Amino acid sequence: MSQNADLQKRRVDAVARGVGNATQLFAVKALNAEIWDADGKRYIDFAGGIGVMNTGHRHPKVMARIQQQLDAVVHSCFQVMPYEPYIELAEQLNKRAPIDGKAKTLFVTTGAEAVENAVKIARAHTKRPGVIAFGGGYHGRTLLTLGLTGKIAPYKIGFGPFPADIFHARFPHAYHGVSVADTLQDIADLFKYDIEPSRVAAFIIEPVIGEGGFVPTPPELMRALRALCDEHGILLIADEVQSGFARTGKLFAMEHYDVKADLITTAKSLAGGMPLSG
């Protein structure tokens, strides 16, 4: 029996069935853009931990910084006893984030946590409940972020009901016959039939729709959303968990637009393979 097959048998016996796998190959070593399985076969890694390894596997600068932190403090909980690297990274992100005014950063662990906290901040700031997301968008697998996600299969089947006050408009996609005008009409209809704008806390959108087909948000839609936000006191959340950290040629995908978001979520390649989001 191969090492992969043996590990697969152990995996079936020990790991919950709800954890899916794209392959039955087990990673034992990785370097740069290559990864080796338990049987010694070498592969080019186009998955990158699902958009996490933008700097490649085991980048020496990333490895050195991880070791430096392990040699100092592994964990103290920033809310109990703060530490400088948290502040240092926040300062670096604040310098680079395409946000009007003074930017500030908080860190959590996963992309879904980042999105949940962005929604919490938007609701607390505006004192409104509603959030409008878009068809095809993906925002995470917690209950709230599944509610925001604009795809039923494969994520949402069997997990409802989802939180209230979440609404969806179609995302403009030429292959689906949906234009920017159609999307804006959907939003107008939501305002007319489902939730008045004075009860909407935020729009949340990916600058590049990921799980919905890797489709960039048209600039005219981003400008229209910014205008609606400014008109009605709504916040614009750019979910950059997948699109951030130079995956589009700029550090943030929002840098391709001539408008700015109020909140930006980050994760994945933010930490070169370590669990960190903000």
Regions found by a protein language model. Name each.
Residues 1-278:
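Conserved N-terminal phosphate-binding loop of PLP-dependent enzymes in the Aspartate aminotransferase
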